[in-house]
C-alpha cells in the first residue's frame, strides 16, 4: 500500500521540483498550440494557475488509470485554462422547460420482440456529419437536435447534409439561443416552420442573431418527435439500433469529462439529476469488457477522441444519459 501512496504523490512532487523549467515550457507550448492570448499579465497568471491545477489532475488520474483504477484516460486540451464551472457556464446550454412532461402521444414504444444488435456505429453507415464546435455559446441543444435530424435525413433520402444549428439558435422562440434550450422544442419548431435550412444556407456564427430563415435554403423537414422512456437504457439501445442517432442529455460538469481522451468514461460523481449538456448518441458497443455509448460532442475535434467520447452503458444510467433522450420523426 505504501508503494501506491508514493506513486500517487510523484506527479505532485514533479510539479514542486520543476515549477519553472518544466511548467514554463509546457505552458508556452500549450498557448502556442491553441493560439491563446490574454489581455494582461494578471489575466494570464490567473489562467496559468487554473491550467496547472488541471494538469495535475490529469497527471494523477492517468497514473491511477495505469494502475487499473479507471477505465478511461485524460489529456490536456484547448479547455486547459478553464475551470469545470466555466465550461458548464459557457459551453453547455441544456435548459429543460419547467413544464416539461412526457405524453403518451410522443412516447417511443420499443420493439422488445426482436433482438437489438450487440453493437452499432452510425459513423460507419454514413449517418453522421463531421464534429462541430459550438464555441462559447450555450447552443449544445441545437447541435444535438441538428445531429438527430441529419441522421433521419440520411435514413430517409440517402443524402447526408450539414443542417443549420444557427437556424435553431436564432429562430426557436421557445428556447433562448446561446442562453440555452431543449431539443424537443427544436423539433417542434422545424415541424411548425415546415423546414430547417442547410448549414451552407444559414452558417453558424456562435452568437444570437435575428431569425433569417429562408425557405429557399430548406434542406429537411420534421413530422414531430418521440421521447425515450425516462432512465431506460434498454429502450435507448433499441432506439439507437432501430431509429438512428438520438439526442441525449448528460451531466458534463466534471473535470474528468472536460479532459476525457480515450477509454470508457465512468465517473461515480456524475450526477444523473444534474443534466446540463446535450449531445448525440451515434451508436453503442463494448470495449475491453466495458459496455458503452458512442457520443458525439460539439466542442470541436480537439476535445475527447476527435470530438467523441465513449460513455458507460448499463451502469445505472450513468450521467443520466437515458433521462431526456429524444429523436425527430421525418
Swiss-Prot record:
It is a peripheral membrane protein. InterPro entries: Papain-like_cys_pep_sf, Pept_asp_AS, Pept_cys_AS, Pept_his_AS, Peptidase_C1A, Peptidase_C1A_C, Peptidase_C1A_papain-like, Prot_inhib_I29. One of its GO terms (biological process) is regulation of transcription by RNA polymerase II. CDD domains: Peptidase_C1A. Residues 1-16 form the signal peptide. Glycans are attached at residue 104. It is found in: Lysosome; Secreted; Apical cell membrane. It catalyses: Broad proteolytic activity. With small-molecule substrates and inhibitors, the major determinant of specificity is P2, which is preferably Leu, Met > Phe, and not Arg. Disulfide bonds join 137-178, 171-211, 270-319. The active site is at residues 140, 277, 297. Residues 17-115 form a propeptide. Gene3D superfamilies: Cysteine proteinases. Keywords: Cell membrane, Disulfide bond, Glycoprotein, Hydrolase, Lysosome, Membrane, Protease, Secreted, Signal, Thiol protease, Zymogen. One of its GO terms (molecular function) is DNA-binding transcription factor activity, RNA polymerase II-specific. One of its GO terms (cellular component) is nucleus. Belongs to the peptidase C1 family. Thiol protease involved in osteoclastic bone resorption and may participate partially in the disorder of bone remodeling. Displays potent endoprotease activity against fibrinogen at acid pH. May play an important role in extracellular matrix degradation. Involved in the release of thyroid hormone thyroxine (T4) by limited proteolysis of TG/thyroglobulin in the thyroid follicle lumen. This is Cathepsin K.
Amino acid at each position: 500500500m505504501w508503494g501506491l501512496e508514493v506513486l500517487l504523490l510523484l506527479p505532485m512532487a514533479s510539479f514542486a521540483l520543476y515549477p519553472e523549467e518544466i511548467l514554463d515550457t509546457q505552458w508556452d507550448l500549450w498557448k502556442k498550440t491553441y493560439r491563446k492570448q490574454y489581455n494582461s499579465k494578471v489575466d494570464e497568471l490567473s489562467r496559468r494557475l487554473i491550467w496547472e491545477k488541471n494538469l495535475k489532475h490529469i497527471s494523477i488520474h492517468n497514473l491511477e488509470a495505469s494502475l487499473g483504477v479507471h477505465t478511461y484516460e485524460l489529456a490536456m486540451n484547448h479547455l486547459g485554462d478553464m475551470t469545470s464551472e466555466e465550461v458548464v457556464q459557457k459551453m453547455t446550454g441544456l435548459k429543460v422547460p419547467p413544464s416539461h412532461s412526457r405524453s403518451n402521444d410522443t412516447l417511443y414504444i420499443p420493439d422488445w420482440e426482436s433482438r437489438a444488435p450487440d453493437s452499432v456505429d452510425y459513423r460507419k453507415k454514413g449517418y453522421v456529419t463531421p464534429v462541430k464546435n459550438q464555441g462559447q455559446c450555450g447552443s449544445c441543444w441545437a447541435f444535438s437536435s441538428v445531429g438527430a435530424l441529419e441522421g433521419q435525413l440520411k435514413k430517409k433520402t440517402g443524402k447526408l447534409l450539414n443542417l443549420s444549428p444557427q437556424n435553431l439558435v436564432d429562430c426557436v422562440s421557445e428556447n433562448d439561443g446561446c442562453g440555452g434550450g431543449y431539443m424537443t422544442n427544436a423539433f417542434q419548431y422545424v415541424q411548425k416552420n415546415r423546414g430547417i435550412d442547410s448549414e451552407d444556407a444559414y452558417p453558424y456564427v456562435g452568437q444570437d442573431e435575428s431569425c433569417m430563415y429562408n425557405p429557399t435554403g430548406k434542406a429537411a423537414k420534421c413530422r414531430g418527435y418521440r421521447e425515450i422512456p425516462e432512465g431506460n437504457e434498454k429502450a435507448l439501445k433499441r432506439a439507437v439500433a432501430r431509429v438512428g442517432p438520438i439526442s441525449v442529455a448528460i451531466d458534463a460538469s466534471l473535470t474528468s469529462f472536460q479532459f476525457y481522451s480515450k477509454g470508457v468514461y465512468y465517473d461515480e460523481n456524475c450526477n444523473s439529476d444534474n443534466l446540463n449538456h446535450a449531445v448525440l448518441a451515434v451508436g453503442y458497443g463494448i470495449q475491453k469488457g466495458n459496455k458503452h455509448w458512442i457520443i458525439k460532442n460539439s466542442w470541436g475535434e480537439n476535445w475527447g477522441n476527435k470530438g467523441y467520447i465513449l460513455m458507460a452503458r448499463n451502469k445505472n444510467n450513468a450521467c443520466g444519459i437515458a433521462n431526456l433522450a429524444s429523436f425527430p420523426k421525418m
